[in-house]
UniProtKB/Swiss-Prot annotation:
<dbReference type="GO" id="GO:0005634">
    <property type="term" value="C:nucleus"/>
</dbReference>
<dbReference type="GO" id="GO:0003677">
    <property type="term" value="F:DNA binding"/>
</dbReference>
<keyword id="KW-0804">Transcription</keyword>
<protein>
    <recommendedName>
        <fullName>Protein BASIC PENTACYSTEINE3</fullName>
    </recommendedName>
</protein>
<comment type="similarity">
    <text>Belongs to the BBR/BPC family.</text>
</comment>
<dbReference type="InterPro" id="IPR010409">
    <property type="entry name" value="GAGA-bd_tscrpt_act"/>
</dbReference>
<keyword id="KW-0805">Transcription regulation</keyword>
<keyword id="KW-0539">Nucleus</keyword>
<comment type="function">
    <text>Transcriptional regulator that specifically binds to GA-rich elements (GAGA-repeats) present in regulatory sequences of genes involved in developmental processes.</text>
</comment>
<dbReference type="Pfam" id="PF06217">
    <property type="entry name" value="GAGA_bind"/>
</dbReference>
<keyword id="KW-0238">DNA-binding</keyword>
């Protein structure tokens, strides 16, 4: 078949692809590019390969035909077997080795599980030992009803030791009996008020009765009785000591209350 017969190229020639060739491969150049070098190396020139001189030997009748399997090579395909052969390259140095990571992860998992199991076993063992040992119960002491009970004295006479110098004599006023007030005809014990002071339980400046009426302004409380401070009570003691009063008896404060309700600022003469 002649070259210009049907305006078709011979089937023995390879037309370069329109796509950009891969960097790792080199395809057979077109026959029209006469300045290109042959595909094979110059050492293998004795082999039969396509060159412009071999194709156009003399004329249209000297066209050489070769089998397609010999002239055109198979389409290249990507092989992933070469990835593991370039371990020292700069590109693959940053790629982590997946197989080694998976193996290390598989080895670490059973170790963590064993540690957890050991800790759980220790807890169970410790708990079992604690639970197995019975607690020793303390024996309750039985009360003997025949033994006499010692009652604590809660007498109002038991007070702190408060020493005061009265007319040159040291006196412990904490040991004195509780003063009383006989304004109602019956002596009633007074209440402690402040530090060493006393308060009446049966009289005010207007009322004299026992018990005192309930305070209307404060629920659950009664009207406050007359008051006497520690300083005023000390003056009462000085007066009674000068009169030769026996302090073993309770002091009657009926005549010693102040007219305005308190002896805090009253001077007794």
């Amino acid at each position: 078949m002649e070259e210009d017969g049907l305006n078709n190229r011979n089937w023995g020639y390879y037309e370069p692809s329109q796509f950009r060739p891969n960097l790792g491969f080199q395809l057979i150049p077109s026959i029209l590019d006469r300045n290109e070098k042959p595909f094979l190396s110059p050492h293998s020139q004795n082999l039969n390969f396509i060159t412009p001189s071999n194709v156009y030997g003399g004329g249209s009748s000297s066209v050489v035909s070769y089998p397609r399997d010999y002239t055109v090579s198979d389409a290249p395909f990507m092989s992933y077997s070469w990835l593991n052969q370039h371990k020292d390259s700069k590109f693959f140095s940053n790629v982590p080795e997946v197989s080694r990571m998976t193996q290390s992860m598989q080895l670490l998992q059973p170790e963590v599980v064993t540690e957890v199991d050991e800790s759980v076993k220790r807890r169970h063992c410790s708990g079992g030992q604690r639970g197995g040992v019975p607690k020793v119960k303390k024996e309750k002491k039985l009360k003997d009803n025949n033994m006499p009970r010692v009652q604590r004295e809660r007498s109002p006479l038991l007070r702190k030791c408060i020493e005061m110098v009265i007319n040159g004599v040291s006196m412990d006023i904490g040991g004195l009996p509780v003063p009383v007030c006989s304004c109602t005809g019956m002596p009633q014990q007074c209440y402690r008020w402040g530090c060493g002071g006393w308060q009446s339980a049966c009289c005010t400046t207007n009322v004299s009765m026992y018990p005192l009426p309930v305070n209307t302004k404060r629920r659950g409380a009664r009207i406050a009785g007359r008051k006497m401070s520690q300083g005023a009570f000390r003056k009462v003691l000085e007066k009674l000591s000068s009169d030769g009063f026996d302090f073993s008896n309770p002091i009657d404060l009926k005549s010693h209350w102040a007219k305005h309700g308190t002896n805090k600022f009253v001077t007794i003469r």
